[in-house]
Amino acid sequence: MLKLICIVFLVTVLTFVVGEDTLDPAEYGCPSDVDMAELTEKNEVCLRCEDFHKEGVAFTLCKTNCFTTEYYKNCVKDLEEAGKETEE
C-alpha cells in the first residue's frame, strides 16, 4: 500500500513539473502563433512581479489578455524601478 501511495505521489509531482515547463498561448489569451521566446520572457516578468509584490493575484492579472493590460505595464515599470534602486 505504501508503494502505491509513493507511486501516485511521484506521478502527481512529475505531472506538475512537466506542466510548468510548457506554456500554452491560449492560457494567456494569446494567438497560437505567438513567439514562444517572447511569451516565456513575459511570463518571467509576471513571475518576478508576483514575487516582488507578494500578491497571489499578481501573476494572473499580469498575464491577462496576452500581457496587454496596464497591470503588466506597471509590473515592468515596478521591476525596472526596483532594479535602479538596487544599483544605487
From Swiss-Prot:
Tissue distribution: Expressed by the venom gland.
Cited Gene3D superfamilies: Crustacean CHH/MIH/GIH neurohormone (1.10.2010.10)
Subcellular locations according to the entry: Secreted
Pfam families linked: Crust_neurohorm
Keywords for this protein: Disulfide bond, Secreted, Signal
One Gene Ontology cellular component annotation held by this UniProt entry: extracellular region
Domain of life according to the entry: Eukaryota
Main subcellular location: secreted
Signal peptide: 1-19
Keyword flag tRNA processing: no
UniProt keyword Signal present: yes
Cysteine disulfide links: C30-C66, C46-C62, C49-C75
Cross-referenced SUPFAM superfamilies: Crustacean CHH/MIH/GIH neurohormone
Function as written in the Swiss-Prot or TrEMBL entry: May increase the toxicity of alpha-latrotoxin and/or other venom components. Is non-toxic to mice and to the cockroach Periplaneta americana.
Family per similarity comment: Belongs to the arthropod CHH/MIH/GIH/VIH hormone family.
Additional record remark: Co-purifies with latroinsectotoxin.
Protein name: Alpha-latrotoxin associated low molecular weight protein 2
